[in-house]
Amino acid sequence: MGIKTQKNFICLKRTFSMNLRDAISVANPVQLEEEIKHDEVVSFLKSKNLLDKPVILNVEGKKVAKNFVSSRETLGKYLGVDAYSIARELSKIEDREAEIRVEPFSSLAMKKVDVNLQELPVIKYFPRDGGRYITAGIVIAQRNGVYNASIHRMLLLDESRVAARLVPPRHTYLMWREAVEREEELEVAVVIGTHPLFLFASATRVPSGKEFSYAAGLMGRLTLYRKGEMLVPDSEIILFGRITAETAKEGPFVDITGTYDIVRDEPVIVFDEMYVKEDYIYYSITPAGKEHQMLMGVPYEPVIYRFVSNVCKVKNVITTPGSCHYFHCVVQIEKKSEGDGKNAIIAALAANPSMKGVVVVDDDIDILSYEDMEFAIATRFQPDRDLVVVKGARGSSLDPSADKTTSKWGIDATKPLGKEGFDRVV
């Protein structure tokens, strides 16, 4: 990342930090003292009706936090906006200049411990899982002065090794391949238990090396801590290691649709050092839970917002919970010309190749209300003129109904201009 530039306002004078513990007052988690085993977490949360609610659990004597980004309302609180304003707020972040400060790693209140991943409360979520998985580990990679931060699931292999799912051609994968081709290893840090906005930034696809800048924009400013050539945020657990040329079987693992992903050969990360805070809080994302889906899909909302703004007056964008916040979206526009709805559909599908369906509505429709959206479809949409179908397009590998390519659809559920009988009285 370009952290040497003036634009990022690097400052070494004083520390400003936002961390996981700062977020507790916002997330307001239910804190449960009853001790459970690492393979009982999902069933326990279901029994308490807390599967998608912010919680801090006692897993084998260790604190485990979950679901701090499991609703639009909570994400909005971190951003200082309401649930309706998230896409608009996020669409401004990339252009926002924010301060990044760098402090020595020694200024973090952490202790070095022997590397033993088995001592962490790493969870096995479902019986058919390939093993215990770190699901909220942010991999920070550095190569040639460029930094990347992204979330990768990691299957525990032993006390010091994991198999990490690296998706080609995303940035961490490309950095690793470059290192392997030069017969080198990719130096990384894996951080667990950051502020939720740093977690969200790491789930967002931004230009190469811009995750720190994006996180700073989300958080107002960002403090990073330098250890050698590596920069890390304030975290509960920090592991330093390297992604090697060795691979190991990774999977099965439940993805956002609640279905199992396939088993693959994935790179092995070897950890050499481990640091933890006193009484650390381990952070975990439940596969296919609302938080998993939010982190996968909501970062696309500002991208769709910006794409649609190029073709018409966009008011709002949401990804829909029924589509795992990933496959479908609703776009709200202020219609000025006939054809705006169809242009919005085309722009939204172009913004995210994984998007499968788009509904475009007017600004009198409550975009967060499924009933309002269905009302718009029922009273303003005619399939023979308002339905757009795109055949043979590239879709998402996460869609079990797709076979290499997919069909995509769009519904223009906007009112025709200048016609009476469409305005709502109640």
UniProtKB/Swiss-Prot annotation:
UniProt keywords, alphabetically: Decarboxylase, Flavoprotein, FMN, Isoprene biosynthesis, Lyase, Manganese, Metal-binding
What EC numbers are recorded for this enzyme?
4.1.1.126
Function description: Catalyzes the conversion of trans-anhydromevalonate 5-phosphate (tAHMP) into isopentenyl phosphate. Involved in the archaeal mevalonate (MVA) pathway, which provides fundamental precursors for isoprenoid biosynthesis, such as isopentenyl diphosphate (IPP) and dimethylallyl diphosphate (DMAPP).
Query: Per the UniProt entry, what are the Gene Ontology biological process annotations, in alphabetical order?
Result: isoprenoid biosynthetic process
Please name the catalytic residues of this protein. Answer: 255 (proton acceptor)
**Where does the chain cross the membrane?**
none
Molecular function GO labels: carboxy-lyase activity; metal ion binding
Task: Tell me its cofactors.
Answer: prenylated FMN; Mn(2+)
Which InterPro entries does this UniProt record tie to the protein?
UbiD, UbiD-like_C, UbiD_Rift_dom
According to UniProt, the name of this protein is: Anhydromevalonate phosphate decarboxylase
Matches recorded under SUPFAM superfamilies: FMN-binding split barrel (SSF50475), UbiD C-terminal domain-like (SSF143968)
GO cellular component, as recorded: cytoplasm
Which enzyme class, named as a word? lyase
Which residues of this UniProt protein bind Mn(2+)? 148, 211
- Name the catalysed reactions: (2E)-3-methyl-5-phosphooxypent-2-enoate + H(+) = isopentenyl phosphate + CO2
Pathway assignment reads: Isoprenoid biosynthesis; isopentenyl diphosphate biosynthesis via mevalonate pathway
Q: Mind telling me which Pfam families this protein's record contains?
A: UbiD, UbiD_C
Similarity remark: Belongs to the UbiD family.
